[in-house]
Amino acid sequence: MASLNPFDLLGDDAEDPSQLAVALSQKVEKAAAAVQPPKAAKFPTKPAPPSQAVRESRNAPQGGRGGTGGRGGFSRGRGNGGYNRDNRNNDAPGNENGFSGGYRRPSEDADGASRGGSVGGYRVGGGREGPRRGGVANGESGDVERPPRNYDRHSRTGHGTGMKRNGGGRGNWGTTEDDIPPTSEEPTTEVEKSPVAEKQGGEDETPEAKKELTAEEKAQKEAEEAEAREMTLEEYEKILEEKKKALQATKVEERKVDTKVFESMQQLSNKKNTDEEIFIKLGSDKEKRKDATEKAKKSLSINEFLKPADGKRYNGRGGGSRGRGGRGGRGEGGNQRYAKEAAAPAIGDTAQFPSLG
C-alpha cells in the first residue's frame, strides 16, 4: 500500500479558487451526460422444447460429489443432468414411472453393473458397491421408491408433523405475549349521577343547619347530665355509708382463719419452759427431710480442700542431680524420687496469705 504525504495540501494556497469551481462544474456536466436512459424491459423468451433441454443437460459438465447421478442416488441437481425444473412436462421415461420431473437418463454406452444397477432405466442404487434404497443391481427389476424430499438430509427425529409457529421461544412455540389477547377499552354504560339530582332526591339540609342541630343536641345532653349529678346531702351520706360497709365486709373475710389446718396438731409441753406451749404438726415429712439433710452435712475445714490430690508425687530439690563427687561422693542416690504428701498451706501464715495479716 502506497503511503500518502500528509503535508501535500500545504502547497495548494497558490491555486485560484475560481479555477477550482469551474473544474467542478465541468465534472458535474460530464457525469449527467454519462447517465443513460433506462432500457425497455425485455419480454420473456419462449422456453426451449423438451428434446433440446435434454440434449443440453447431457452435454453439460458433470457435477460435484455424485458424479453422473449425484451422491449415488436420484440426481438433485448436483450431478450431470440432475432434476430440471424446465423438464417437468417432458417426454422422459421417468414420467412413466409416476415420478414428477425429469431425472437423469442413463447413457446408452454406460454399463449398468459399473453404475451400481438401475431400475427401469433410472438409477436407484448408489455408489460403486451396489444399489441403494432397496434397488436391485445389475439391471434387475425391483420396487422403485419415491424420490427423496428436498430436506431429506436433515434429521426428523423429535419433530412433530405440525407446522412451526412463527415467533420466538423454545421450540418455536412463540412467546407468552402472543397468547394474551389485546385489551380494548369498552365504553362504560354507567351514567354518572349529577350532584344536583342527589340534592333534589335527598334532604335539603345544608351543613350549616346540621351543625346548628348538633350544637342544640349537645346543650340538651349537658343539661340532663347536670340534673342527674345534683343530689342532696342525705343521699350523698347514704352512698358513703354503703361504701364503708362494703370495705368492712371484705376486711372481715380476709381475717378469717380456717380451723381445718389445726386438726392434725397436738398440744405438748416443753420440759425447759413449762409456761410455753409448743404445737407440733404430726405427719409432716418436710421437717424430717430437712433434719436428714442437715445430719448428712459435715463440718469440713478449708485445709482439706486446699490439699493436693492423694498419691501425687513430686521431686524434691536436687532430685534430678547427680551430686558433686560422682557415684561414691555426696550425691549418692541423687536420682531417687521421694513420694511425699504435700502439706496444706497454713492460713495464718502472712507470707502465703499477705492480705489476711
From Swiss-Prot:
Entry keyword set: Acetylation, Cytoplasm, Nucleus, Phosphoprotein, RNA-binding, Translation regulation
Biased composition (Low complexity): 31-45
Occurrences of domain FF (ranges): 239-299
One GO term (biological process): regulation of translation
N-acetylalanine carried by residues: A2
GO function terms (MF aspect): mRNA binding
Biased composition range(s): Basic and acidic residues: 143-155, 190-232
Location of the protein in the cell: Nucleus; Cytoplasm, Perinuclear region
Keyword presence, Protein transport: no
InterPro entries reported for this sequence: HABP4/SERBP1-like, HABP4_PAIRBP1-bd, STM1-like_N
PTM-bearing positions, type Phosphoserine: S355
Pfam families tied to this protein: HABP4_PAI-RBP1, Stm1_N
UniProt feature, compositional bias: Gly residues: 63-82, 114-128, 159-172, 316-334
Region ranges (Disordered): 25-232, 308-357
GO cellular component, one term: nucleus
PANTHER family xrefs: HYALURONIC ACID-BINDING PROTEIN 4 (PTHR12299), RGG REPEATS NUCLEAR RNA BINDING PROTEIN C (PTHR12299:SF78)
Family, similarity comment: Belongs to the SERBP1-HABP4 family.
Stated name of the protein: RGG repeats nuclear RNA binding protein C
Source organism per UniProt: Arabidopsis thaliana (Mouse-ear cress)
